[in-house]
């Protein structure tokens, strides 16, 4: 077992590249939001609401990536490279099927999707065009997300970082080109942002495939993409399915929050879009350490070091909490800068909401960081994805969403207080999460012996 100083160095070598990847992902969203701010508030709101649909798909990918990551990390810790590649092929096949389903729905029924989130005709029209174009990115996004999660799980974290950097550059360049009509091209507005995302996702896949062809570590192999392995499929489903359900339940709840805000008014939607973007910056560090927890715990369990996995999980929880507090301070420090930047881009009411929303969302991501470290890091890394599914289903859909709905439409509270009720969701489930953590039933070695 590493001493605390060496462990911090080890955890940092895993967490910092993940933080960089999260930062780049956030910067992509920032670039989209900032550039759309130059188009119109309607375009910004349309993109934000349309992305609630893609966010559901991303949560499916995240759940599948969790199954991939946990299994790959444990088998890598055991030293079974062949099984790691089989898991990758299996996950990519499932990802492709889901991507195609979401593509067909968003390409053929974009208007119906947008009407779920808003009743503004202008926002519906702009969001529908956005969805039709961005749907072409789904297959590419699924492949790259699964492939890079497998690499991260075995400690190969540089390629995902490089891939995200290239993707960011491609996305920003394409956004600028299509939004502002550079190089003689027409101005495409919100559609241009979607097209830029498609091109960026294609670049990610090209980098992943290029690495796979040359790699001596883990490769994507066509034979494993089509290979049948009932045992691995069973194990993958056992971990990935609860994780997928967990993330879909969580994402649907966030979509329900967005729908509630959307029906209150575009000012709420625009302010929330910027507030979420800002908070994601502050949450990057704590989420990086939380995600590193999965790798660390899984690999130790794959080596059958139960006590070490338990101790490392405890250390990662402490680190994540401290880092989340630092993130709070960063968000509050940059709040005046954000308000000044958007003052001439949003309505006066939206700016008023934004100033309050930024403060409210800071405490939410502290709770999110702790819960993510435990539910997605410790519990899933230990093979227990079922608990997160149960606790999120109960607390999001029987507590958080109903309370927010009641605040908005029954008690008709002012919009700011509706938002406050919405930000309490992470703390409502935290006591139950800690009880499960201290029981230590989540520590499990799930590897098998294959010939």
Indicate where each model-derived feature is located.
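Transmembrane helical elements of multi-pass membrane transporters/channels
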Residues: 13-32, 133, 144, 167, ...
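Helix-terminus/linker motif at the lipid-water interface of multi-pass membrane proteins
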Residues: 23, 27-45, 114-121, 177-188, ...
């Amino acid at each position: 077992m590493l001493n605390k100083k060496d462990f911090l160095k080890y955890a940092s070598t895993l967490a910092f590249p993940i933080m960089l990847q999260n930062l780049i992902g956030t910067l992509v969203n920032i670039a989209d939001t900032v550039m759309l701010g130059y188009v119109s508030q309607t375009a910004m709101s349309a993109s934000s609401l349309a992305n609630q649909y893609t966010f559901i798909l991303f949560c499916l990918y995240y759940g599948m990536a969790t199954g991939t990551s946990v299994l790959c990390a444990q088998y890598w810790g055991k030293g079974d490279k062949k099984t790691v590649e089989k898991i990758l092929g299996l996950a990519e096949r499932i990802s492709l099927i889901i991507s195609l389903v979401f593509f067909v729905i968003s390409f053929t029924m974009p208007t119906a999707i947008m009407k779920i989130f808003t009743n503004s005709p202008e926002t519906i029209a702009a969001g529908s065009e956005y969805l039709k174009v961005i749907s072409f990115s789904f297959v590419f996004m699924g492949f790259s997300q699964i492939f890079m999660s497998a690499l991260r799980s075995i400690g190969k974290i540089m390629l995902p970082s490089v891939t995200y950097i290239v993707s960011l550059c491609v996305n920003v360049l394409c956004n600028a080109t299509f939004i502002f009509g550079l190089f003689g091209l027409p101005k495409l507005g919100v559609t241009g942002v979607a097209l830029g995302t498609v091109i960026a996702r294609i670049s990610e896949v090209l980098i992943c495939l290029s690495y796979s062809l040359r790699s001596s570590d883990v490769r994507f192999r066509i034979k494993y993409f089509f290979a049948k392995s009932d045992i691995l499929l069973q194990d993958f489903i056992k971990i990935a399915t609860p994780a997928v359900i967990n993330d879909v339940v969580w994402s649907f709840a966030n979509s329900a929050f967005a729908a509630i805000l959307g029906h209150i008014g575009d000012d709420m939607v625009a302010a929330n879009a910027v507030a979420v973007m800002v908070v994601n910056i502050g949450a990057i560090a704590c989420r990086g350490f939380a995600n590193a927890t999965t790798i660390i715990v899984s690999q130790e369990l794959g080596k059958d070091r139960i006590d070490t996995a338990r101790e490392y999980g405890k250390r990662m929880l402490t680190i994540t909490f401290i880092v989340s507090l630092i993130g709070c301070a960063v968000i509050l420090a940059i709040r005046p800068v954000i308000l000044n930047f958007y003052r001439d881009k949003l309505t006066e009411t939206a700016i008023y909401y934004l100033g309050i929303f930024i403060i409210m969302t800071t405490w939410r991501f502290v709770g999110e960081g702790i819960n993510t470290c435990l539910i997605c890091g410790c519990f899933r890394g230990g093979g227990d994805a079922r608990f997160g599914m149960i606790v999120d289903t109960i607390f999001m859909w029987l507590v958080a969403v109903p309370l927010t709905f009641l605040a908005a439409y029954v008690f008709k509270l002012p919009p700011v207080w509706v938002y406050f009720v919405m930000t309490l969701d992470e703390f409502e489930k935290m006591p139950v999460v800690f009880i499960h953590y201290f029981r230590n039933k989540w520590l499990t070695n799930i590897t098998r012996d294959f010939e």
